[in-house]
């Protein structure tokens, strides 16, 4: 007998005649390579090695700082030890022999690392005292001050978020307010707040001590100076995330079930906290090592002040030990923040059960940014028509008048003219640095395994040290402050983007989109970026006044513009000693900075995500595909017979032209 024919699988339905799919573009292949790289760097061992490599690179850069600065380290150390001593060749030779500078930076760094492995951080080049006890003592003081400042920041953030919490818990959604008061508070420089509190509360009223560090009463004013601006910024970030949390389905179901508004508000805070915890960890490190100005004003022997003095005097053992302590603190704080965030979210990150909290929101008020912008423009234009360098010693520290609306400074120069002319360079550089930081933060935030260690390491570097490192590599010039600030300004934005990206990847709609066949480029372009970029852009605008102030503040170290340049930071520093006699000379540039902060926050309200744009384009594409195409009817053929193939073709075309998420 003949063998039976083998059974065959059912015949596949005939494919519709659709055009061939185009070859993958360069953008698609780049997205695929990015996804593969992101999967590769998820290995924990590579993350640890990457973090160790960054810390070693930072310590090596600090070890090369005296040689990068193109100055003789022996001369700097000699001046720091005794300013009156003549820098003769014999004196410089003695210093080189004592410190072993002739051996070179590589040998010195190896000796310091070898001693560190034995628990010996070396001796100070200036005082000769052991480094480790002084660094540990300064770190303890800074941690205590940071704890008080964080308590003030949390209370301030709660006050800023009180209105959104109250409205959201009662289902009263309105257009978002600009939050100008919080923005003005966040835009105030810390050293100005510290000077005002020390002068008014500490000296004039005598309520609290203004100098020293001897007990809890001495901690109140410094904690207020550091905590108020940080709390205002943290509160604005939290208030920006609350409307999306209250609009999720669980909040609607809880309200329909009859849960109290207090419980709904508490769960909304729990939903928003994981996205802000990485930035909270950055605040911890920044308040510990970056509070140099506040520690100088209140005479606090903290780690920031110790690091600044060591960087200025090029005391390498103290500088390296202080920086290493900040790097370790940043690693611990960053790890705890990410661990607590994952603990608060629970298994939803693995199950993909989150709901996207970044949705289209009602448009913000347009009148407020217009008013703030016109006021700032009026101040700048009024100052540009005046002379910022004209000296009049007979008109020193005059109060505001018709001739001088903002008064005069200690040299008789018009304050309004200096504010207006300083706005040209300060605002232009601040906008450029903020744009670069936003771009770098978003791009690095897409690879959290790489950017996480870099964020912790960069955030541990005080701005002063970053300025000195950049000046040593690129040299001192008008754009050196911009390079230094841009080198560290991307870190909080990258941390924010990474936290949002982690939550967005665990959302239900993204899991469904991938299951329906969406590729990495489609997911990145139409799902991830629209959810991450708008809140990070608003965060960048919130930091715009701080960037402007940081640019001007680095001019004090000789790294940028020098007097008589009308930089806003220079205006504050020059007039700060006369704040008690002529407060208008300090309040004028501070008020302009606060106005810039209010303008940035009110303008940030218009940066809203539009997730529905893609769906609208899909609907328009389907409508175009379903329209009957004009066809030529052959002679002698009825028109009704020609319509049927057109309808069938249009329906097939609509099914083929739909994107992958609608199959």
Model regions: which residues?
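Transmembrane alpha-helix signature in integral membrane proteins
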Residues: 48-56, 132-163, 224, 269, ...
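Transmembrane alpha-helices
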Residues: 52-61, 262-294, 427-436, 521-553, ...
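An internal, D/E-rich "acidic patch" concept
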Residues: 101-154, 158, 409-410
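Transmembrane-helix boundary motif in ABC transporter permease subunits
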Residues: 125-129, 145-183, 195, 199, ...
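Hydrophobic alpha-helical transmembrane segments of polytopic membrane proteins
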Residues: 149-155, 222-233, 304-340, 568-604
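Generic hydrophobic transmembrane alpha-helix motif, especially the helices
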Residues: 176-232, 405, 454-495, 499-503
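C-terminal transmembrane helix and the adjacent membrane-cytosol boundary/short C-terminal tail
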Residues: 320-361, 485-488, 499, 542, ...
């Amino acid at each position: 007998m003949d063998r039976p024919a083998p059974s065959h699988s059912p015949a596949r339905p005939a494919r519709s005649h659709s055009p061939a799919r185009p070859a993958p573009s360069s953008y698609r292949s780049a997205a695929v390579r990015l996804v593969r790289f992101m999967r590769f760097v998820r290995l924990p061992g590579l993350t640890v090695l990457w973090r160790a490599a960054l810390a070693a690179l930072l310590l090596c850069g600090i070890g090369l700082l005296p040689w990068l600065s193109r100055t003789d380290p022996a001369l700097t150390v000699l001046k720091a030890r005794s300013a009156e001593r003549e820098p003769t060749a014999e004196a410089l030779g003695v210093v080189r022999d004592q410190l072993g500078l002739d051996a070179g930076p590589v040998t010195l760094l190896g000796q310091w690392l070898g001693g560190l492995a034995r628990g010996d951080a070396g001796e100070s080049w200036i005082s000769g005292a052991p480094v480790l006890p002084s660094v540990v003592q300064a770190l303890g003081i800074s941690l205590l001050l940071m704890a008080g400042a964080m308590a003030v920041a949390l209370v301030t953030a709660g006050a800023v978020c009180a209105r959104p919490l109250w409205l959201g818990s009662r289902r009263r959604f309105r257009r978002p307010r600009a939050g100008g008061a919080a923005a003005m508070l966040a835009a105030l420089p810390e050293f100005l707040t510290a000077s005002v509190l020390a002068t008014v509360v500490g000296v004039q009223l005598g309520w609290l001590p203004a100098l020293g560090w001897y007990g809890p009463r001495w901690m109140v004013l410094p904690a207020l100076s550091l905590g108020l601006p940080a709390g205002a910024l943290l509160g604005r970030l939290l208030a920006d995330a609350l409307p999306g949390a209250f609009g999720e389905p669980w909040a609607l179901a809880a309200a329909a079930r009859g849960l109290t508004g207090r419980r709904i508000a508490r769960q909304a805070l729990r939903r928003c906290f994981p996205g802000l915890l990485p930035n909270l960890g950055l605040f911890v490190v920044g308040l510990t090592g970056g509070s140099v100005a506040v520690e100088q004003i209140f005479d606090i022997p903290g780690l920031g002040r110790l690091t600044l003095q060591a960087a200025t005097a090029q005391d390498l053992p103290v500088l390296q030990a202080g920086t290493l302590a900040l790097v370790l603190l940043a690693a611990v704080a960053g790890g705890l923040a990410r661990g607590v965030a994952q603990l608060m979210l629970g298994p939803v990150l693995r199950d993909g059960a989150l709901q996207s909290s970044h949705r289209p929101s009602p448009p913000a008020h347009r009148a407020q940014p217009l008013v703030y912008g016109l006021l700032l423009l009026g101040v700048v234009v009024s100052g540009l028509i005046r002379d910022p360098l004209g000296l009049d010693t007979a008109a020193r520290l005059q109060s505001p008048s018709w001739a001088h609306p903002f008064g005069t400074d200690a040299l008789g120069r018009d304050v309004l003219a200096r504010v207006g002319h300083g706005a040209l360079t300060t605002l232009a550089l601040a906008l450029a640095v903020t744009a670069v930081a936003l771009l770098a933060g978003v791009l690095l935030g897409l690879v959290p395994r790489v950017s996480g260690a870099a964020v912790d390491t960069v955030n541990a570097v005080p701005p002063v040290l970053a300025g000195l490192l950049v000046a040593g590599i690129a040299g001192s010039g008008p754009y050196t402050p911009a390079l230094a600030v841009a080198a560290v300004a991307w870190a909080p934005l990258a941390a924010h983007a990474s936290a949002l990206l982690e939550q967005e990847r665990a959302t239900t709609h993204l899991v469904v989109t991938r299951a329906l066949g969406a590729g990495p480029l489609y997911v990145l372009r139409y799902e991830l970026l629209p959810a991450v970029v708008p809140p990070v852009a608003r965060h960048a605008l919130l930091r715009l006044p701080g960037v402007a102030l940081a640019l001007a503040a680095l001019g004090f170290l000789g790294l940028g513009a020098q007097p008589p340049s009308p930089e806003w930071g220079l205006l504050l520093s020059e007039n700060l000693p006369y704040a008690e006699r002529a407060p208008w000379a300090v309040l004028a540039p501070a008020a302009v900075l606060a106005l810039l902060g209010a303008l940035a926050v009110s303008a940030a309200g218009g940066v809203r995500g539009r997730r529905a744009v893609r769906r609208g384009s899909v609907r328009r594409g389907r409508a175009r595909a379903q329209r009957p195409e004009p066809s030529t009817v052959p002679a002698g053929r009825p028109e009704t017979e020609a319509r049927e193939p057109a309808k069938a073709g249009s329906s097939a075309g609509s099914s083929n032209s739909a994107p992958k998420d609608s199959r």
